[in-house]
């Protein structure tokens, strides 16, 4: 019996010393949720509603010199009551050298400062209108909402270190299918997107971006043919982000036909082939790590003319219960000239959110 007890104990000890592979130990699970209430008094279309803005579940890991990420999203992307679950990120990145990191898979397009910003960190009820329309969210071309992402390959890096070792220049360039997330290339023509920015002082970035490509599967209403439409875009960006002070401004311009709204695959010739927009915002601490005040001015013109400009003047607060739980509130006065009746151009908008991370 003593011999059996010894053997059992030895066997138990062997089981407790099983070594877990390093790549398994490196896997991290995280996520976040965004709960929302919105109301507006647009004449003839007043509404208010609770909404589940976003939920994401994320796996991050590392295998040698390669980082990887898989991210699934649940959202009411089509509006309240129409939930969508989809894979948004799936990529690996070779990170051995800071001056040349190579990413392959499905990930954020290399366009603008705001696009890759975490939606909670971004601090507002939504990304700016011009980002949504010209950076692959609810894209002007009619591409389905892709969260600013596509499938492809990207090279990026930080170079030109100063005397303190801080790099002064960042570059990034990518080649993508051009169709958004979870879709193969439909016309064998790739999108090329690139950008670069200088970092003259800690916390400051000044950059520019360019994008040329196409989108397939669009209907020409004149001929009835299915065609590809061009995407030629550029952006200028500036940002200061340090010690809880965040200021950012961007201007985007697009040339190329489109439907004007996500999910619509028919060219809308009436709005022309150009669009542009801009935003400027500031978020500042009122109570450090607890309460921030914010203001944003933004405009989007779907035909690059003032007769169809939509402008929002926004103010609000972000209150942090903890680092992982916050409440956001904002009020906006909206001037929407895409509404046919001039007497209905102006209305009020309110958004409140409870956001959490885990």
Residues covered by each model-derived region:
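Outer membrane beta-barrel
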Residues: 16-178, 186-193, 197-206, 281-285, ...
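Active-site-proximal beta-alpha loop/turn segments in soluble metabolic enzymes
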Residues: 174-183, 217-222
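Cleavable N-terminal export/targeting peptides
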Residues: 1-20
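Interfacial loop-to-helix transition and helix-capping segments at the boundaries
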Residues: 183-189, 273-275
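Charge-dense, low-complexity intrinsically disordered segments
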Residues: 142, 183, 269
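Outer-membrane beta-barrel pore domains
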Residues: 42-45, 91-93, 103-106, 115, ...
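Short, electropositive, low-hydrophobicity segments enriched in small/polar residues
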Residues: 35, 109, 182, 211, ...
């Amino acid at each position: 019996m003593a011999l059996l007890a010894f053997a059992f104990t030895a066997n138990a000890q062997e089981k407790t010393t099983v070594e877990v592979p390093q790549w398994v130990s490196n896997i991290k699970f995280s996520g976040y949720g965004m709960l929302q209430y919105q109301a507006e008094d647009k004449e003839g279309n007043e509404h208010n509603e609770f909404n589940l803005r976003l939920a994401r579940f994320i796996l991050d890991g590392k295998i040698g010199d390669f980082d990887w990420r898989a991210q699934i999203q649940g959202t009411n992307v089509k509006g309240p009551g129409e939930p969508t679950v989809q894979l948004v990120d799936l990529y690996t990145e070779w990170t051995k050298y800071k001056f040349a990191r190579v990413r392959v898979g499905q990930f954020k397009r290399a366009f603008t400062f705001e696009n890759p910003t975490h939606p909670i960190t971004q601090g507002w009820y939504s990304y700016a209108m011009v980002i949504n329309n010209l950076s692959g969210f609810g894209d002007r071309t009619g591409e389905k909402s892709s969260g600013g992402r596509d499938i492809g390959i990207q090279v990026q890096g930080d170079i030109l270190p100063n005397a303190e070792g801080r790099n002064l220049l960042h570059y990034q360039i990518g080649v993508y299918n051009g169709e958004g997330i979870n879709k193969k290339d439909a016309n064998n023509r790739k999108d090329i997107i690139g950008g670069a920015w200088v970092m003259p002082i800690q916390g400051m970035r000044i950059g520019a971006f360019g994008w040329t490509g196409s989108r397939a599967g669009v209907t020409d209403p004149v001929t009835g043919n299915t065609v590809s439409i061009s995407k030629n875009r550029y952006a200028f960006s500036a940002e200061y982000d340090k010690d809880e002070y965040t200021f950012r401004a961007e201007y985007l311009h697009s040339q190329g036909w489109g439907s004007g709204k996500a999910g619509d695959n028919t060219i809308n010739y009436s709005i022309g082939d150009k669009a542009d927009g801009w935003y400027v915002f500031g978020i500042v601490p009122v109570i450090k790590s607890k309460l921030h005040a914010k203001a944003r001015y933004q405009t989007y013109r779907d035909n690059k003319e003032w007769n169809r400009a939509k402008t929002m003047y926004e103010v609000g607060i972000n209150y942090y219960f903890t680092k992982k739980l916050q409440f956001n509130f904002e009020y906006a006065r909206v001037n929407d000239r895409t509404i046919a009746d001039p007497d209905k151009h102006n209305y009020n908008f309110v958004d409140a959110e409870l956001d959490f991370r885990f």
